[in-house]
């Protein structure tokens, strides 16, 4: 027989197992599983004979291996024989007598009533511990009987509804009825000297005394300590008034020189809202600001304000390039701020000061306080409420300012075009770039900004410029 080329075979695998080999392997697996759950050695009907086979003494069957016997024990025949054997043994077994119960003999006697009693409440003078003293009279107690006692809870008795606040102390002695005393349900102190009983055989009196344990007084409730950094709630109000705020740890040192103490900071919450404008410190006590001294102008020339230095003679800054707008409203000169609200322009007919000469301070305007910082270098301060005007030489009517990119003449040299005469003496020319206006017309309204000058390419030509001054149009591609 060819064992190498059988169908389904694989070289080196030993060939395909036959059906008998598969059954043998299956039975061995089942036997191993049965041995894990059933101990064959403890089976009273399992027996191995001298031939090496296995027998069932209950069913008288023969088995070649352990697996066969285990399969037999789970079969119907073996289970039926087990039930029949159990019924037979139960029928033949003798009936065993039931165990006798221990019987307690109940004493039978005629009750003659309740005994007399006396209860005394006591308190320890040193510790304040409470106690009860019971005295029970048994004059007709039976011979050889000693009174007995016990504590009973409220749930053991059947006379009253159970109440956990009370307990009962029972006293019993023949032939008297059992009596009970209702006491508070507190822990009993059974230490030596705190709980004792005494039976006097001569007087036939029974004494019992016990003490209640001391109850610790409840501690005052204390606020729990919160985590660090968390403040405790404020104390309650006393008489409807909040407690005083804590005093500061240290007061600020007194100022030197005997000056008055600064005001204390307010203890209430800080006021909310935007901060106000900065205020100047008040003048020292007893010092009044000097009154303004106004001198009359001499021959149309206004003197400068006190403390103001005039510019150096012969130094004139270049005139700025200002294009007059097309409308009839002229902007102020460069560097000249429009008047603040509430400050009116000069009345008509009042001439501005000459170049380089500063106007006097207005009447009713106080000079600056000594705490005002000095002006920046090369800037001359003016009286309060009056804005400075740059010292610019006026130009004759019809003379245009230099174009952008053209350097001004050197300081001290003032070229004049031919045919233009300087103004007569005593007549003050207007500021550069500012055209005189008729009386009753204000130079600018407070709070109204001048219009932005238009570039030369967009504004219309002025009559003074003439057709020759119009810039050429931009080249086209």
UniProtKB/Swiss-Prot annotation:
GO terms for molecular function: nucleic acid binding; zinc ion binding. One of its GO terms (biological process) is spliceosomal complex assembly. The keyword Nucleus applies. Keywords: Acetylation, Metal-binding, mRNA processing, mRNA splicing, Nucleus, Phosphoprotein, Repeat, Spliceosome, Zinc, Zinc-finger. The modification N-acetylmethionine is found at residue 1. Residues 217-295, 303-323, 331-362, 399-441, 448-477 have a biased composition (Pro residues). A zinc finger (Matrin-type) spans 54-84. Residues 379-398 have a biased composition (Low complexity). Residues 1-27, 217-477 are annotated as: Disordered. SUPFAM superfamilies: beta-beta-alpha zinc fingers (SSF57667). Component of the 17S U2 SnRNP complex, a ribonucleoprotein complex that contains small nuclear RNA (snRNA) U2 and a number of specific proteins. Part of the SF3A subcomplex of the 17S U2 SnRNP complex which is composed of three subunits; SF3A3/SAP61, SF3A2/SAP62 and SF3A1/SAP114. SF3A associates with the splicing factor SF3B and a 12S RNA unit to form the mature 17S U2 small nuclear ribonucleoprotein complex (17S U2 snRNP). Identified in the spliceosome 'E' complex, a precursor of the spliceosome 'A' complex. Identified in the spliceosome 'A' and 'B' complexes. Belongs to the SF3A2 family. This is Splicing factor 3A subunit 2. It comes from Bos taurus. The lineage of its organism: Eukaryota, Metazoa, Chordata, Craniata, Vertebrata.
